[in-house]
């Protein structure tokens, strides 16, 4: 008997369940299935707008973990496309609130371009490195964030990590 998650992965031809456990057939398919079901809004803690996005990104507090476009740009040290949004996970809400308070005169609430997500998953924090989430998480968050800049970023990730491709 298999649970509904394993059944779903079997139906998508991602895994094969047998008496000795699971065999992963396609890591890329698992990643893309996760990406299509991912909803960033569910983890959104704060959203705001700071017009000078580049300086805000460079000046983020130490206890945030970059993801999505800025996460890949930091990890790969290149930008496959220009982006106008920053997504990151906040590990210390009090410190982030202080960071926001210091920039209060620059912060607007309309048309947000900075998205702070809750880092409630200890695994997410433990698998991050140098203030950036792991590559599969970056891929999934870019896919979920969508927008015109998403496709060049996703293609660049797959070119750098072919195991993440669908086929």
Model-derived features: where do they sit?
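Loop-centered beta-sheet repeat module
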Residues: 1-33
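Short acidic, glycine/serine/threonine-rich loops at helix termini
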Residues: 36
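Long, low-complexity, charge-rich intrinsically disordered regions
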Residues: 39-167
């Amino acid at each position: 008997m298999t649970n509904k998650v394993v059944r779903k992965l079997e139906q998508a031809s991602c895994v094969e369940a047998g008496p000795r456990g699971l065999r992963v057939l396609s890591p890329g398919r698992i990643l893309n299935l996760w990406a299509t079901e991912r909803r960033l809004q569910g983890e959104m803690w704060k959203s705001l707008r700071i017009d000078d996005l580049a300086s805000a990104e460079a000046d983020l507090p130490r206890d945030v973990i970059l993801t999505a476009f800025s996460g890949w740009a930091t990890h790969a040290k290149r930008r496959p496309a220009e982006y106008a949004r920053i997504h990151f996970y906040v590990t210390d809400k009090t410190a982030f609130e202080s960071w926001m308070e210091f920039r209060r005169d620059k912060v607007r609430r309309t048309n947000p371009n900075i998205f702070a997500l809750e880092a409630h998953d200890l695994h997410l924090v433990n698998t991050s490195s140098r203030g950036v989430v792991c590559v599969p998480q970056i891929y999934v968050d870019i896919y979920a964030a969508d927008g015109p800049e998403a496709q060049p970023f996703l293609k660049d990730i797959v070119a750098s990590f072919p195991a993440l491709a669908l086929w």
